[in-house]
């Protein structure tokens, strides 16, 4: 039976909100490891925003850190603007990811966050979350796990760009994306790229032409099937090997 206070919150939000207790990707997000009482406390501080449309921004570089954003659905890209005025993509965030961690140190966002497709996010006031985590060890631990995961991702990206050639970079990108989809309960073998080839090239330090040529090469070798933005992994062992991994896509 659904507790009365949760029903009231649903009525107040128009009956369309998905709360932490019911969210399908909560195991990837802040609620993981929290008990029911802790979940209720967290739920009370979260604002469920209306859908964010493609091209809209969650925050801009230089904005004061007021909230973190947990992605419920869709894809958000983070990027900075170089001194030359060029966009440099620093990450692609999927459902279950938390966006805005990199602003905690200075109190201001060093990057932009923009929706690549219609997305749903939970807005979490940072000061309130920080205060709550001081009272809830499980919440504090989970925040540290999420931040650790982001640091590890940054380290992997540095290694990717410094050690791998163009083929290996793209293979690693597709392989890692498939693993992330699998963690979220989606097919790791068949998926749609929400980012453009230009975005992928920008992120990997490659040209659009190189991305297109490599995708064609991967398809010709039987490793992938490519149809527009849709990718099917035909030979997961070959992809994993080229990406520098030995485990199968599962």
From Swiss-Prot:
Region entry Essential for the oxygen-regulated activity, spans: 20-29
Region (Activating region 1A): 71-75
Gene: fnr
Organism annotation: Salmonella typhi
Coiled coil: none
Residues annotated to bind [4Fe-4S] cluster: 20, 23, 29, 122
Signal peptide start-end: none
Region Activating region 3D, residue ranges: 112
Annotated region described as Activating region 2C, given as residue ranges: 127-128
Stretches for region Activating region 3A: 60-61
Protein name: Fumarate and nitrate reduction regulatory protein
Region listing for Activating region 3C, in residue ranges: 85-87
GO molecular function, one term: metal ion binding
Cofactor note: Binds 1 [4Fe-4S] cluster per subunit.
């Amino acid at each position: 039976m659904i507790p009365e206070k949760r029903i009231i919150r649903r009525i107040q939000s128009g009956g369309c909100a998905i709360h932490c207790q019911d969210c399908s990707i909560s195991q990837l997000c802040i609620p993981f490891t929290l008990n029911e009482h802790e979940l209720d406390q967290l739920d009370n501080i979260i604002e469920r925003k209306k859908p964010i449309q493609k091209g809209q921004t969650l925050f801009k570089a230089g904005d004061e850190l007021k909230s973190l954003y947990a992605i419920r659905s869709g894809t958000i890209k983070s990027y900075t603007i170089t001194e030359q005025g060029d966009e440099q993509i620093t990450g692609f965030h999927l459902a279950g990811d938390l966006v805005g961690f990199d602003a905690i140190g200075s109190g201001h966002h060093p990057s932009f966050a923009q929706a690549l497709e219609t997305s749903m996010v939970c807005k979490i006031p940072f000061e309130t979350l920080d205060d709550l985590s001081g009272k809830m060890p499980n919440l504090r631990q989970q925040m540290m796990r999420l931040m650790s995961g982001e640091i590890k991702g940054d380290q992997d990206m540095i290694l990717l760009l410094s050690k791998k050639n163009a083929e290996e970079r793209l293979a690693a990108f597709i392989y890692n994306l498939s693993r992330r989809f699998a963690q979220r309960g989606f097919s790791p073998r068949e998926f749609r790229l929400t980012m453009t080839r230009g975005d992928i090239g920008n992120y990997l330090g490659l040209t659009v032409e190189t991305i297109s040529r490599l995708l064609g090469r991967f398809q010709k070798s039987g490793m992938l099937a490519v149809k527009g933005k849709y990718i099917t992994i035909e030979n997961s062992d070959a992809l994993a090997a080229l990406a520098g991994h030995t485990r199968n896509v599962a």
